[in-house]
């Protein structure tokens, strides 16, 4: 049972557009009961125990969904500890995230299994952002494009290994990053599709033709577009070219202005269907960390002046971002992306792509995971399942 609430005097960004000067009623089931224009508010009759909260002319949006991150606040999936995952949940709620997919690095198989089991154990115990399931980045990826993943964990395609990872996840693995060019990938892709696991092309040296072959067996999404993948060349489109050319290919994007230049983000939005673009952070354990040494997947890290983490021993190697979804939202809006499009990328699209029923859009009957922002895009409140878990109205 949730507390009944009414949010008034806001622009409601539904996930398919925006409605100015509107309000949202959250019912006792933790669902969106109604969306109404403020001209009708005086004629509305709500139960007497309903709390009325004034958005003050700000924005009422779906809670943001981060479908790819490794850590935040000094806690990460590499800790192999349910406590760390639950701490991530708390810290993500502080920055407007209502749901997330903790992402497991490529590592030794035993380490990956421990990480997966820790996330599964944490599920259902959250006091902040809900854990939707597990994102596994590897291990069937290209050594040439390994990036910050542990090269010792990179493996050839092996269905027995895949099954060990799936079994460790107890049905909670939602998606996995793979290199489509690897031998045996067709069989693995069909096997994954039977189990409802979304495969993303990433950490890949695939040719344009390899990506087309992957699409034929259901590899229709891609990991942190432009990063850790074969480049666009006028004689070989590579993975980057394939994702740009093929309208059905979906892609993640890290909107920190460092991993991808803002003008390329704008180009992507111009040339690709908005439905197929997902905002992520790829944030690391030391994101928003206060004090202590900075490490990510065991690699000593340094926070560069541009806000991205680089390997301490190799400042040319990006190992992930220090981004939050809320800052990513502000960034793309600064790059002249309308807020309704930004919210679609941060909430609606990941919910649809990963089959998250009744999430990612503000429509009656959907789960009341709601983010309230002021006019300057600062967080005022976060509701999860209709419960006000972060209150900054005062």
Q: PLM features: what roles do these ranges have?
A:
Residues 68, 136, 192, 222, ...:
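Conserved, mostly hydrophobic/aromatic
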Residues 55-114:
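Metal-associated gating/positioning segment near the N- to mid-region
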Residues 6, 63-65, 200, 279-280:
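Residue-level marker for buried hydrophobic side chains located in beta-strands
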Residues 1-6, 12-61:
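Histidine-rich, glycine-flanked metal-binding segment
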Residues 10, 352, 362-394:
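C-terminal cap of metal-dependent C-N hydrolases
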Residues 238, 242-251, 270-281, 287-366, ...:
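His/Asp/Glu-enriched, well-ordered alpha-helical/loop segment
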Residues 167-290:
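Active-site core of metal-dependent hydrolases
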Residues 89-172:
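Divalent-metal coordination cores built from histidine and acidic residues
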């Amino acid at each position: 049972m949730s507390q009944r609430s009414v949010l008034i005097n806001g622009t409601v960004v539904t996930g398919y557009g925006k409605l100015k000067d509107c309000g949202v009623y959250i019912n006792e089931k933790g669902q969106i009961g109604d969306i109404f224009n403020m001209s009708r508010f005086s004629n509305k009759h709500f139960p007497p125990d309903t709390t009325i909260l004034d958005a003050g002319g700000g924005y009422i949006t779906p809670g943001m969904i981060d479908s790819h991150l490794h850590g935040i606040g000094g806690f990460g999936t590499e800790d192999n500890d349910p406590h760390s995952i639950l701490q991530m949940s708390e810290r993500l709620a502080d920055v407007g995230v209502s749901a997330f997919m903790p992402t497991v690095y490529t590592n030794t198989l035993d380490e990956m299994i421990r990480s997966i089991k820790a996330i599964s154990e944490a599920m259902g115990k959250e006091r902040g952002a809900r854990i939707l399931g597990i994102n596994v980045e590897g291990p069937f990826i290209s050594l040439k494009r390994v990036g910050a993943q542990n090269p010792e964990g990179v493996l050839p395609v092996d269905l027995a290994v895949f099954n060990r990872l799936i079994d460790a996840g107890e049905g909670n693995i939602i998606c996995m990053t793979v290199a489509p060019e690897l031998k045996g990938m067709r069989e693995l892709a069909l096997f994954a599709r039977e189990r409802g696991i979304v495969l993303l092309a990433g950490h890949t040296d695939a040719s344009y033709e390899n990506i087309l072959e992957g699409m034929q067996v259901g590899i229709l999404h891609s990991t942190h577009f432009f990063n850790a993948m074969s480049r666009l060349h006028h004689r070989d489109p590579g993975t980057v070219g394939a994702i740009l050319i093929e309208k059905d290919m979906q892609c993640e994007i890290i909107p920190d202005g460092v991993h991808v230049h803002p003008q390329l983000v704008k180009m992507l939005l111009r040339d690709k269907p908005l439905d197929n673009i997902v905002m992520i952070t790829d944030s690391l354990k030391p994101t928003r960390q206060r004090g202590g040494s900075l490490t990510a997947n065991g690699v000593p890290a340094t926070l560069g002046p541009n806000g991205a983490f680089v390997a301490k021993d190799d400042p040319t190697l990006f190992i992930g971002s220090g981004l939050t979804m809320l800052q990513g939202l502000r960034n793309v809006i600064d790059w002249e992306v309308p807020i309704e499009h930004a919210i679609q990328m941060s909430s609606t699209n990941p919910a649809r792509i990963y089959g998250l029923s009744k999430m990612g859009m503000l429509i009656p009957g959907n789960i009341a995971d709601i983010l309230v922002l002021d006019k300057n895009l600062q967080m005022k409140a976060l509701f999860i399942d209709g419960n006000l878990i972060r209150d900054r109205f005062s």
